Amino acid sequence: MTAPLASRIALVTGASRGIGYATARALARAGAHVVAVARTQGGLEELDDEIKKDGGSATLVPLNLTDFDGIARLGAALHERHGKLDILVGNAGVAGPSSPLGHIELKPWNDVMAINVTANFQLIRCMEPLLKQSDAGRAVFVTSGAANKAAAYLGPYGASKAALETLVRTWANETASTPIRVNLFNPGPIRTRMRATVFPGEDPMTLDTPEQAAEFIVPMCSPAWGETGKFYDYKTRTLMSFRAPA
């Protein structure tokens, strides 16, 4: 039986651990060739080993996403090698400082915005032409409930995810008349290292695993997925539309 994503090229950021790692493996199992991007070489090599064990294939790209020129070079390399991109999963993110806003220095604020917002903006700029070369370009960006909760002491993270959501929804509107479908995925509380750092008193064994969440991202990357500009909430298993105030 032909794998559902056979011959598809999938770019996944933050692929060395957590949801990105699990999503990269799941996409590869579904037949996609995965272009795995992360800062951590060791994590990428471990991912490559697992993908090969599963019978899949991957290209490893050690890249800090604050290297915005590096993202542009990656786009050029993908164009030269594949001529297209079928799937973009913007997963990489950082939590940033957990402090009152008035106590946060400008540098850590900028660091959070660089990874969570600007890197995704640069991915959109550099990968859109490649996604347009696909017969069914699909983009999924990982967000958080923090975008709307305005939780105390998580200001940089919440603000960055709110900005990401507006960025992604805008792109979805701009590409609505094309074959590209653009959506957001909110995993909610998941058993990741970043979650453990922000909530150290939480029992991780009460949380779902990245592998469980990844199984819901894969269908959003399929040519059969027709929705765009939507928000999939993993915790409630609900696909939501955004509503603007009247």
Region annotations inferred by a language model:
Residues 16-18:
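Conserved glycine-rich cofactor-binding loop
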Residues 30-46:
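Conserved glycine-rich Rossmann-like NAD(P)H-binding loop of the short-chain dehydrogenase/reductase
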Residues 42, 62-73, 106:
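The beta1-alpha1 cofactor-binding region of Rossmann-like NAD(H)/NADP(H)-dependent oxidoreductases
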Residues 99-101, 108-110:
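Substrate-binding pocket helix/loop in short-chain dehydrogenase/reductase
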Residues 124, 160:
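Active-site helix of classical SDR
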Residues 144:
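Residue(s) in the substrate-gating loop at a strand-loop-helix junction
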Residues 177, 184-185, 192, 201-246:
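C-terminal helical subdomain
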